[in-house]
Amino acid sequence: GGSSGTQTFNYTGAIQTFTVPVGVTSITIDARGAQGGGSNGGAGGLGARMTGTYTVTPGQVLSVVVGQQGLLQVGGNAQNSSGGGGGSFVFGAGPTLLVAAGGGGGKCNWLSSSPLHPEAAGQITTAGGASSDGNPGGTGGNGGPAGLWSAVPCAGGGTGWSSNGGGPYGGLGYNTWTGGPGFC
């Protein structure tokens, strides 16, 4: 026996909690990092997705962080680039990490109506695909790095569990987990 059901958490800007119900001894978690911010050249990189089943005890309290989508700098010109997405995480006391899904990198768009260097997606355990300038994707729950323009970071990298997003406009890591600002 045991309870079955689904509970969905959305971005709130705060740590949320889940208390394991009576009779439940295992849960399946499907966590997704937030997408990086888009720009006039298209959408930002997708956040990583992590799914796993975990042994729990009734009454156990888990903390849930849902990442924020990367923010677009509103400047009214074609040079807008965006911040990286926030990571999404589930952890117990300590904190003991159960799931880390890094956020996607923001779109870099500099003096162009199309993206010069695409963002990188967040990943879980393997390196993500590189952008056109060779900028690698995130690893181990870290977010994707910033997009580059002539070797200058011009969009934020996505947030990971233990690291901030790459570049000056990256999302913030542990204890903050927010999407990064845009750049104009």
Placement of each model-derived feature along the sequence:
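Boundary/junction segments of secreted and surface-exposed precursor proteins
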Residues: G1-G13
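Calcium-regulated, polybasic anionic-phospholipid
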Residues: S26-G42
